[in-house]
Design a protein with these regions (language model features):
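Core structural elements
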Residues: 143, 147-149, 154-203
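Active-site cavity-forming subdomains of large catalytic enzyme subunits
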Residues: 1-133, 137, 146-160, 175-182
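Intrinsic disorder at enzyme termini
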Residues: 25, 29-34, 189, 198, ...
Length: 207
């Protein structure tokens, strides 16, 4: 009871928190986090909290850590923050940073499957096959965007045909219109990898 299941839990960490942890200083947690006059605020020992985070990550693989300022600095969509692509959150498990009304589209390429002669002295990574499959994966993810657009258009048509009054339907219609705009303009895809540890082990590489 009271436990989160079916999702990875991540902690959103800013540079000033990490600096406070390094310097063993106190850090103010607050809500809303970007408010000049927060409705809730509490000071915590940053170093002690950081040790607790990394201990639990070591012990149970939870929580993940999202270095938020690094994400904002290095995220390609944040180059277009003035056009509405500023990163504000992630999908439930934290794999992909998202701007408002954007969608989580993920595909993982299994790195272990590209190891030839695994767990032998002749083990090697098949880079040519990997490059070929990554290109196919990206092409497929882009096609998924078009399928998503079709579904959103059907949802919008359904909203329009519903018998409810326009004042009732307006909120839902505007929501899906915003999602459609982000989908067609940004066309964000999330091609990632999995089984990195298995790949390294199969190649006899320590990490």
């Amino acid at each position: 009871q009271g436990k989160v299941t079916g999702a990875n839990v991540s902690v959103k960490v800013h540079d000033d928190f990490m600096q406070a942890a390094i310097n063993k200083q106190m850090y103010q947690q607050q809500y809303p986090i970007d408010a000049t006059e927060p409705s809730f605020a509490k000071e915590v020992d940053a170093h002690k909290l950081w040790k607790k985070i990394i201990h639990n990550a070591w012990k149970s693989a939870e929580p993940g850590v999202l270095f938020w300022d690094t994400i904002a600095r290095e995220s390609v969509p944040d180059c277009y923050a003035d056009l509405g692509y500023k990163t504000v959150s992630t999908n439930p498990c934290g794999e992909i940073p998202l701007c408002p009304y954007d969608s989580c589209r993920l595909l993982a390429v299994n790195l272990y499957s590209y190891v030839k002669n695994p767990f032998t002295a002749e083990a090697e990574f098949d880079f040519e096959l990997f490059k070929k499959h990554v290109a196919v994966a990206q092409r497929m993810m882009d096609d998924i965007i078009d399928l998503e657009v079709e579904k959103i258009e059907k949802i919008l048509a359904k909203v329009s045909s519903d018998p409810e009054a326009e004042t009732i339907k307006r909120t839902e219609r505007e929501l899906w219109e915003k999602i459609l705009a982000k989908t067609t303009q940004g066309r964000r895809t999330g091609v990632g990898t999995t089984a990195e540890g298995d790949m390294l082990a199969a190649m006899g590489l320590r990490y």
